[in-house]
Structure formats: structure tokens, C-alpha cells
From Swiss-Prot:
This is Outer capsid protein VP5. One of its GO terms (molecular function) is structural molecule activity. VP5 protein is one of the two proteins (with VP2) which constitute the virus particle outer capsid. Acts as a membrane permeabilization protein that mediates release of viral particles from endosomal compartments into the cytoplasm. Permeabilization activity is probably negatively regulated by VP2 and is triggered by endosomal degradation of VP2 and exposure to low pH. Pfam families: Orbi_VP5. It comes from Broadhaven virus (BRD). It is found in: Virion. The gene is Segment-6.
Length: 480
């Protein structure tokens, strides 16, 4: 019964579907769909993109026919390039002029595009370089201001800093000297430790000096011999205190170059300031170690510290003189030079300072040091020393030795007046000097007493202690 009902209903269902499809196919909507699609295809074909696509199909087919390539690949490439707007028209293969012309046009077009891209790149680079150049100029301006500020601070405080360093060391040595003068029971624990360490260090130094004494003397004698030979054969004769001697050996030959110890302070004034050095081992210490029977006793150590304190006081006075006299002269000189300098150099403090340093330069023969000379004859026996004192002392003298004739000559130097205030090397108002050859015996007595020489003249060239002895015990001035 059930199967009969299904068999009766199924044909009816199919009839209903068939009638629906018939109505849909005959409806106006179905008729309008093909016409709309046709119109869309027509509009696409009439559009620019459609025209390019159609032209691409035609050009692809033509290219495939001419070149033998795959039709599908040629058509696809031509359609894509045409739609993208980068496809070139295929030249006539039978017209070589057209082919060459199109190739030249393509080359010119590519070259033009590269040039335009390069111009755009150059413009951007020029803008960046202009920006960087502006930043560099700004930094240079800032650097000039910083340098000027540094120079002003340095010129104003460097000498004060040097004075403070020297004063601090002198005060420490004063405390050490006072501790050495006291009895051992009166010293503090720190003072005892300090003196024990000082005694230990100088004991080791004294042993080294004793062990190497013979080698030092031999080296000094060899240096003197070589210096005399060089002076005799290689130097020119110039007038000097009424005699013809060799040109100056600016730094002392012989043992002075061996015992020159220490470091040079920073030259801020353009002047020669090597004499302001604080030596690591003072000449008084070397003198005491060589002459004292007990170089590590309290008395010897006190003598070492007191001699160093005197040297530090002299350096302190010299730095105070440079700060009070030379620094204002340097500043005034810088101002005068800046007024005359070109506009592009007025703000460059380094150039102005360099010119001022040259203006205030002290000649070599007037610099504070021991200038050693030797004669072109008998250089083994004749030695001339020009001792120029510090700037603040304004003193200098000439000391001549003739070991062959057993005589020496001492004379004040009054003719040197370098352009550094105040004028230096001037004698007292009532001073009048004349050549006064004196026997060498008093000199030998002084040097022997100071421990500077011994049998056979082995230590004559330890000249710094000798000169200090002569300066303190020089012969009386003779009046004309």
C-alpha cells in the first residue's frame, strides 16, 4: 500500500520540477541575463583595458608566428604587458630601419630615466651634505668657543696650580725636616715610619753610588774627552767676554748631562722653564751621599731635605714671578697681536698664543741654565761656564777654569737683557768688574771642602755642587 502511494507521488514531483524549469527558462529575467552579459562583454571590449587585452592577443599571436615561440606564452606575455602599459609595439620584421629606430629609442628612454633618477639622487645627497656641513660648522664654532674658554682657564690657573704643587711638597718636606731635627723620643709614630722608610731608601741609593762610583767617573772622563775633541774640530770661534772661544754647547757637556734628572713643567708662557722642574733626586742628595761619612744619619737626611726645600723655595719664587710679571705681559701681547691679525685668525686663540710666544722668546744664551763652553785649543784644560740665574733673580756670572795655568776667572754678566720684565742680569749700582785672574788654589780648597773633587781630579765635572759653592763663596768684587 505504501509503495503504491510513493509510485504515484514521484511522477507528480518530477512534473512540478519540469514545469518550474520551463517557467524559469521562459521568464523575462532569464532573457535579460544573456543580453546583460553581452552588453558587459561589449563594454569590456570597447574599454581601454579591453582594447589592450585584444591587442595583446593579436600581438602575441603575431609574435609567435614570427619568432616560432609558444602561442600560449607569447599571448599571455603580450596581454599582461599590454594591460600593464609597458609593452612595446612589435616592429615590422621586414623593416630593419624601424627595428633599429625602436632599439635606439628604447636606449634613449632608459638613459633618460637613469639620468633623471641620478639627478633626483644627487639632489637628495646635496641636501644631506648641506645639512651635515651646517652641523659641522656649528660644531666648529662651538669648538672655537670651548678652546678659547680652555685657553683662558689654562692661562689663568696653570701657574697657580704649579705653585700649589711646589708649595705642597715644600710644606711636606718642612715637616720631614722638623721631624729629623727632633729627638727620636719626641717623634710621632707616623714620623718614625716616614724617617725609617727614608733612611732605608737612601741607604740603598748610597750603596749603588758607592758600587758604581768608579764607572761613573770613567764615563764622565770619556764624555769630557769626546766633548773636547768635538769642540776643537767642529765648532766655530765667536767673541765671548773678550776672548775667542767655540760656539756655545747649549746644554752642559760632561757629567751635567748624566746628572740631569727630573721633568719639565708645562710651558704656558712660551719661555724656557726647564729650570722649574722638581727633580726626582736632588743634587744635594747626591752631594751628601758622595761626601758624607754616614749618609743615612739623621743629620745627613736633614741636610738632604733642607737642600731640597731651598730648591723648592727658589722654584716657588720663580713661578710667582712668572705669574705676576710674565703672564700679564703675555696677555697684553696676545691682545696686541689679535688687533693686527687678519679677521679669520682673530678668534683662533692657538695661533695668537703661538705668535705671542715667539715674541716673548728668550734667546738660548740668556735662558736660566749652566751654559758650558770649551775653547778650540787646550780643551782638556780650559772650561768656561756661563751660569744664568732664574728669571726672578736677575743675576748671571761667567766662571772660567784653566787647569794648565792653575787659575780661574770670575766675572758678573751685565750685558744680557732679554725682553722679559724685569730686565735681568744687571749688577748693583756700585759694581764695576775687570778681568782678575786668581790662583786656582782657593778654588781647589773650596771644591775639596765641598767634596766635589778628590785625588787626580776625578770628580771635577760634578759641576752643579761646584757652582753652588762658588756662588755662595765667590771672591770679592774689585773696583776699577
Amino acid at each position: 500500500m505504501t509503495s503504491k502511494r510513493l509510485g504515484a507521488r514521484f511522477p507528480g514531483f518530477l512534473n512540478r520540477i519540469g514545469s518550474g524549469i520551463t517557467r524559469a527558462a521562459r521568464s523575462d529575467t532569464t532573457k535579460r541575463i544573456p543580453s546583460a552579459a553581452g552588453r558587459a562583454v561589449e563594454r569590456v571590449a570597447a574599454s581601454e583595458i579591453g582594447q589592450r587585452a585584444i591587442a595583446g592577443v593579436v600581438e602575441g599571436a603575431a609574435t609567435a608566428a614570427l619568432t616560432g615561440e609558444s602561442v600560449g606564452e607569447s599571448v599571455k606575455r603580450a596581454v599582461i604587458l599590454n594591460v600593464a602599459g609597458v609593452h612595446q609595439t612589435v616592429p615590422d620584421p621586414l623593416n630593419p630601419v624601424e627595428i633599429e629606430t625602436q632599439a635606439k629609442l628604447r636606449e634613449l628612454d632608459l638613459a633618460n630615466k637613469r639620468e633623471e633618477a641620478q639627478i633626483r639622487h644627487n639632489k637628495s645627497m646635496l641636501q644631506k651634505e648641506a645639512q651635515i656641513l651646517g652641523e659641522v660648522q656649528h660644531l666648529m664654532t662651538v669648538q672655537e668657543h670651548v678652546d678659547q674658554a680652555k685657553y683662558e682657564v689654562r692661562s689663568g690657573r696653570a701657574l697657580q696650580a704649579a705653585q700649589a704643587i711646589v708649595k705642597g711638597e715644600r710644606q711636606q718636606l718642612d715637616r720631614v725636616t722638623k721631624a729629623l731635627i727632633r729627638e727620636n723620643e719626641m717623634r710621632t709614630t707616623d714620623e718614625r715610619k716616614l724617617i725609617e722608610g727614608m733612611r732605608h731608601n737612601y741607604s740603598a741609593l748610597a750603596k749603588s753610588v758607592d758600587a758604581d762610583s768608579a764607572l761613573i767617573e770613567e764615563a764622565v772622563e770619556q764624555t769630557v774627552d769626546i766633548g773636547g775633541e768635538i769642540a776643537e774640530h767642529a765648532t766655530a770661534s765667536i767673541p765671548f767676554v773678550g776672548e775667542a772661544v767655540s760656539a756655545g754647547m747649549a746644554t752642559a757637556r760632561g757629567a751635567m748631562q748624566i746628572y740631569r734628572l727630573g721633568k719639565t713643567i708645562h710651558a704656558i708662557t712660551g719661555l724656557h722653564t726647564n729650570h722649574c722642574e722638581i727633580p726626582a733626586i736632588h743634587q744635594g742628595a747626591i752631594e751628601t751621599l758622595l761626601t758624607s761619612d754616614s749618609p743615612t744619619s739623621d743629620a745627613s737626611l736633614a741636610q738632604i731635605t733642607s737642600s731640597r726645600v731651598r730648591h723648592l723655595r727658589e722654584i716657588e719664587s720663580e713661578l710667582a714671578h712668572l705669574d705676576a710679571e710674565v703672564k700679564p705681559a703675555m696677555q697684553q701681547m696676545c691682545q696686541d697681536i689679535a688687533k693686527l691679525a687678519p679677521d679669520h685668525l682673530k678668534k683662533r686663540r692657538g695661533v695668537i698664543h703661538m705668535n705671542a710666544a715667539h715674541e716673548l722668546r728668550v734667546p738660548l744664551k740668556q735662558r736660566p741654565m749652566i751654559h758650558s763652553y770649551t775653547s778650540p785649543w787646550d780643551s782638556d784644560y780650559v772650561l768656561i761656564l756661563h751660569v744664568v740665574g732664574p728669571y726672578h733673580s736677575g743675576q748671571a756670572f761667567v766662571f772660567c777654569l784653566d787647569l794648565a795655568l792653575d787659575q780661574f776667572h770670575f766675572e758678573e754678566d751685565t750685558g744680557s737683557k732679554p725682553p722679559v720684565p724685569p730686565p735681568r742680569h744687571r749688577a748693583p749700582a756700585d759694581f764695576s768688574a775687570r778681568p782678575a785672574p786668581i790662583s786656582l788654589s782657593p778654588l781647589l780648597a773650596i771644591l775639596t771642602q765641598r767634596g766635589c773633587i778628590g785625588p787626580g781630579w776625578p770628580r771635577v765635572l760634578m759641576i752643579r755642587p761646584c757652582i753652588s759653592a762658588l756662588y755662595r763663596t765667590r771672591p770679592p768684587t774689585r773696583r776699577c
